[in-house]
């Protein structure tokens, strides 16, 4: 809220905080624990508060990021003596140049039956995925991608909303060393082509539709257009998020739009297409992931 002082200058009044953490929560916070590590390693640094820690983090860049690396216990096959090279270049700076690691391996390190992801669609459909189940799903899709020839440096795209299957596809692609790119299915066709056309993906994960403003919106016609235009695509993987494309009750649903590895559906529109759920079932016995560690 703003007001003016006696000389007509704008003065901002601070509103009362909506919420404050308890002392117990502050003590258990990761930032508090990290500050204690910094204070132990660098006794001369005042790390007692965020305001005190921040100036050090941006003036002693190498020390700060080395502490972050160690505190996070990053999984890597090779660590790096150098933290950052050419820091004055932006872009151009190189971080931990000798390290080899995998993004997905670090994100999937936790196991157990605790909830890893909560997905809630606009229509009210809610799913919870445990850390164990997430790892299993990623293992299956990674195996499917590998069998399809996806290798380090290949591009995998997602024409997907923010749902569990999107996270699974991203982690599966990055576990293999592939590059992930995505955009929402409510993008217009040209907007999608401007993004995906540049990276030339080998595989496209695409939702059959999405929910918005109380309605289910079909995406399959747009997916068909994208598949026809991107010559690099070797596989389209359809994720069934809506039960059936609106106004196509007589078309046979999603399966009738697919060709390629879907048996018994010759009157179709999307070439080289498979169902995400079929990939999961086919590779359900895969329980481990061979993470590709890269520089």
Model-inferred region functions:
Residues 10-91:
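N-terminal amphipathic, basic-rich helices that act as targeting or association modules
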Residues 123, 203-295:
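ANL superfamily adenylate-forming
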Residues 52-56, 117-171, 188-193, 267, ...:
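Conserved AMP-binding/adenylate-forming core of the ANL superfamily
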Residues 36, 40-45, 104-133, 244-247:
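AMP-dependent adenylate-forming
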Residues 157-160, 166, 170, 174-226:
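Short beta-strand->loop structural element characteristic of the AMP-binding/adenylate-forming
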Residues 66-80, 97-118:
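A short N-terminal helical cap/helix-turn-helix that marks the beginning
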């Amino acid at each position: 809220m703003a007001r003016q002082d006696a000389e007509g200058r704008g003065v901002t009044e601070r509103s009362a905080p909506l919420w404050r953490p308890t002392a117990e929560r502050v003590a258990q916070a990761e930032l508090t624990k990290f500050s204690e590590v910094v204070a132990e390693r660098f006794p001369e640094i005042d790390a007692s508060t965020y305001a005190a820690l921040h100036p050090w983090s941006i003036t002693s860049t190498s020390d700060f990021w080395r502490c972050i690396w160690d505190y996070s216990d990053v999984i890597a096959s090779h660590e790096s003596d150098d933290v950052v090279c050419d820091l004055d270049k932006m872009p151009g700076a190189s971080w931990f140049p000798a390290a080899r690691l995998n993004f997905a391996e670090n994100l999937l390190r936790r196991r157990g039956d605790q909830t890893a992801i909560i997905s809630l669609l606009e229509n009210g459909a809610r799913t919870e995925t445990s850390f164990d189940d997430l790892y299993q799903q990623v293992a299956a899709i990674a195996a499917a991608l590998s069998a399809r020839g996806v290798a380090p440096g290949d591009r995998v795209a997602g024409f997907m909303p923010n749902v569990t299957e999107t996270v699974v596809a991203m982690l599966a692609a990055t576990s293999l060393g592939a590059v992930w790119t995505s955009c929402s299915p409510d993008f217009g066709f040209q907007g999608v082509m401007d993004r995906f056309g540049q990276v030339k993906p080998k595989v496209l994960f695409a939702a059959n539709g999405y929910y918005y403003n109380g309605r289910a919106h079909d995406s399959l016609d747009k997916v068909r257009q994208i598949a026809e235009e991107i010559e690099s695509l070797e596989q389209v993987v359809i994720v069934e998020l809506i039960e059936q494309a609106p106004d196509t009750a007589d078309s046979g649903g999603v399966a009738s739009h697919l060709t390629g590895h879907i048996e018994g559906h010759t009157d179709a529109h999307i070439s080289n297409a498979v169902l995400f759920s079929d990939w999961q079932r086919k590779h359900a016995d895969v329980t481990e992931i061979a993470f590709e560690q890269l520089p």
